[in-house]
Amino acid sequence: MKSILEQLSSMTVVVADTGDLDSIKKFQPRDATTNPSLILAAAKNPDYVKLIDKSLESSENALPQGFTEIDLIKETVDQVSVFFGKEILKIISGRVSTEVDARLSFDTQATVEKARKLINLYKNFGIEKERILIKIAATWEGIKAAEILEKEGIKCNLTLLFNFCQAVTCANAKITLISPFVGRILDWHKAKTGKTSFVGAEDPGVISVTQIYKYFKEKGFKTEVMGASFRNLDEIKELAGCDLLTIAPKFLEELKKEKGELVRKLDVSTQINHSIDYEFEEKDFRLSMLEDQMASEKLSEGITGFSKAIEELEELLLKRYSEIKNHKLISAN
C-alpha cells in the first residue's frame, strides 16, 4: 500500500516548509517555502557557512564605496534569502517563496520596492520571476502591495493569513496564492478555551481553510490556497485535496512512514453555495480584523516574531562579517 505522503501528493501539491537543503533533497517536493525564522535556522547551521560568506561577499560587491556595516548587513539579509532560494531552486522543479522584510508589513511602497529588489537579485542569477513567489504579510498594506506587484507579473504569496476577510480581499486583488495558518489558529483557540484537543474536522484551523477553499472554488477565484503551519498529522489529512499544503520535514517524514487509506476531504465539486459575493473595502477590512481577536492577535504576533528573526539574522551576519575581517587582518600580518 502507498504511504500517506504518496497518496496526499496525488491530490494536493506537497510543499516543503523549510530552508534546509538536505530535507528538500530528501523529500523532493515540487515547491518550497521559506520565512525569516526558517532562513535564520538554516543560517545557524554550520553546513551553510560558505553560503553565508558568499552572501556577504556578494553584498560587498553590490554596494557603492564608503558603505557602512549597517548598509552591508541590510543588503546581506536580502542576499542570503535569495542565495538560499537559488540553491533550493536547483533541487525542486517548481517555485520557492521568499519573504519580504516583515518590518515593512504596514508600508505598501516599501514592500513593493523590496519585492522588486528580490526579483532583480534572482534575475542576476538567471532565475526568472515565474519561479518565485514573494511572501508578504496579509495586512491591508501588504495586500495592496501585492496587487501592484501582480500587475507587474510578480507573483505573490500572502502569508500570516488567519481569517476569511483576509482571504477574500486577497482573492479580489487577484493574488496568486494565500497561506492560511492552520496551526496558529488552533494554538489561539486552545489557549483561550482551555480545551486541549480539537479532533479532525473540529479543528478551528481546518474549519477556516475549508471555508476559504470552498468559497474560492464556488466563486471561481484563481487564487491558490496553501494550508500552512501545521501542529499535527490530522490537520494535514483533513485538508487532503487542498490546492497546496506546505509541510515541515518532521511531518513529511511521518507521512512517508505511515500506511493506510487517505480520504480526499476537499474537492472542487464540494461547494457550500454562498449567495453573497464578499468584498471588503479598507474600512471594512480594518473593522473585520479589529473584531476578530484571534486574527488580529495572531497577525501582530506573527509580524513581531518574523521581525525578531530578521534582527537575530542581522546580528548573526554582523558577527560572521567581523570574524571574516579579523581573519583577513591576521592573515595579512
From Swiss-Prot:
Active site, renumbered: 135
Location within or outside the cell: Cytoplasm
Biological process terms in GO annotation: carbohydrate metabolic process; pentose-phosphate shunt
Principal location listed in the UniProt entry: cytoplasm
Keywords: Cytoplasm, Pentose shunt, Schiff base, Transferase
Catalytic activity, as annotated: D-sedoheptulose 7-phosphate + D-glyceraldehyde 3-phosphate = D-erythrose 4-phosphate + beta-D-fructose 6-phosphate
EC number(s) stated in the UniProt entry for this protein: 2.2.1.2
This protein's GO CC annotations: cytoplasm
Family note: Belongs to the transaldolase family. Type 1 subfamily.
UniProt subunit comment: Homodimer.
Protein name in UniProt: Transaldolase
The organism of origin for this protein: Prochlorococcus marinus (strain MIT 9301)
Lineage: Bacteria, Bacillati, Cyanobacteriota, Cyanophyceae, Synechococcales
Gene that this sequence comes from: tal
